[in-house]
Amino acid sequence: MCIRDRPESLRSEAARRPIAEAHGDVMVVAAYGLILPQAVLDLPRWGCVNIHASLLPRWRGAAPIQRAILAGDEETGITLMQMEAGLDTGPILAMARLPIGPEETAGSLHDRLAALGAREIVALLPRLAAGEVVPQPQDERLAVYAAKIGKEEARIDWQRPAAQIARQVRAFNPHPGAWTVLDGQLLKLWQVRCCEGQGQPGEVLQASPAGIVVGCGEGALCVLELQKAGGRRVDAAAFLAGHALAPGAVLGE
């Protein structure tokens, strides 16, 4: 029998009672966001297994998918971990790797990792029941923390290299959305690519239906999809049809 639940808190005995009364063999945790108290970890016969969206111990914490893309990692994966009181510190039960594509967004990578995690946990549980799994401790020397993403972190700094900003746009798609300012109004960028061009950081070098080319601290970005405050996501051609944007305009001011 499988019981699904997402309690807002497990601090109280009343909140933990349904888990205790289920007399479960194992509890599987995915994208829960809270550290489980030891009283909960001790309830299932085989403990609690977390499906974590990174190759632990790299990217422990709340935002492993976004951090992997921001860092330019070429691969990530799923770690099935025996949960303990620390934050993503428990021994590893299984691991599966996945390449990060050059145009990968946090949204697309999340979906691929979710599918991979589902397959891996289904494969693990019978082995766990049979006593065939040998937990492997994490190497603390390799631990990297994936801090929670804040809105201000999604603000584009045009002084940075184009490749770094492109990763930022992909990492924050769909949430919270990488953003800049145009004429005092917030502007979110959803799809960009690095391109040739040289100019001042944030300067519009070219504005055509094929894309809006913007200078960066190193190189340039071609903006392909964007969204003004209160509007919808549109391609460059649709945006320019409704907005006068000429070379020389500056983003970020």
Q: Model segments located where?
A:
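C-terminal accessory region of SF2 helicases/translocases
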Residues: 167-168, 173-253
